[in-house]
Amino acid sequence: MFMKSNAVPSSYVTLRPRYIPYWPLWLGLAACVVAMVWSSFIVPVIPDFACLSTIGLDGLALAMAVMVMPRHFVIGFLASLLPFMISWRVAAIHGSVPGMATSTVAFMIYLMLYVDCMVHDRAAGWNDHLQWQTATIRIYFGFDMVGHFAEKLFAGVHSFHHMEQVFVGFGFPPDGQAVIAGGLCELSVAIGVGMGVLTRLAGIGGALYYLIANHYGRHFGDGFTWNNAPVGGWEYPMLMIVAFASFAIAGAGKFSIDGWLIAHGWMPRFLLPLCVSDACTHVQRDARRSA
């Protein structure tokens, strides 16, 4: 362990918003739940199990925001943001205007909380500024996978069967197993990279997944530029591969599940190489201050 688990890591004291309260997000997420109920049962545009996905995921996001975020901002923020993003994506797939509108407002509140937290932490020094740069890029690239796995796993029967036919075009059998496997891989990358859970392992996994997926997508045979005919070149796939692989170098940084667990001394030692290349700088600094 890097430090005693009952100590409060000093670098995490400032990792919370200073000016933006939590209650606007609670109201925003509650409005999202109401909007998803409306679009599922009152004016039903969200079909079959997708209605359970949107309502349940927004409910989970609200629970994390209310019960966890005020006490442990990093954990609560990341654990709330991912299910919210999935629900937002499913609402957009099915054209739920109330769902998209309320989700847009809620997302702006998430963004304000994140920026407020970053500004609150600004006195930490240039190294921590780089940590915020890394965190922003990591969260974006990790949660970019939401747009891919949501339509495979959470958007309903019609969306699943559509993706099943897409995978048939890639040469897979029409049994849906490849759709489920691909969706679970993408969900794992979103959790691992976006939330920062075993980030080095997730970065390697994400890079390998994109390498394999885009082999089947035949992008590597269409040149470099993404808008090349017929399916687009390898510009975008290579961007994703390099981005994911880069997180295998040093891990996620402090605004992550890995960073939080390591700083509190709760990450098992045998998992540390899958999270960070060495003791994080903010963990080393906290250890010196607590000595």
Residue ranges of each PLM-predicted region?
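A generic structural signal for ordered alpha-helices
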Residues: 127-128, 159, 166-169, 189, ...
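Core segments of transmembrane alpha-helices
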Residues: 185-190, 240
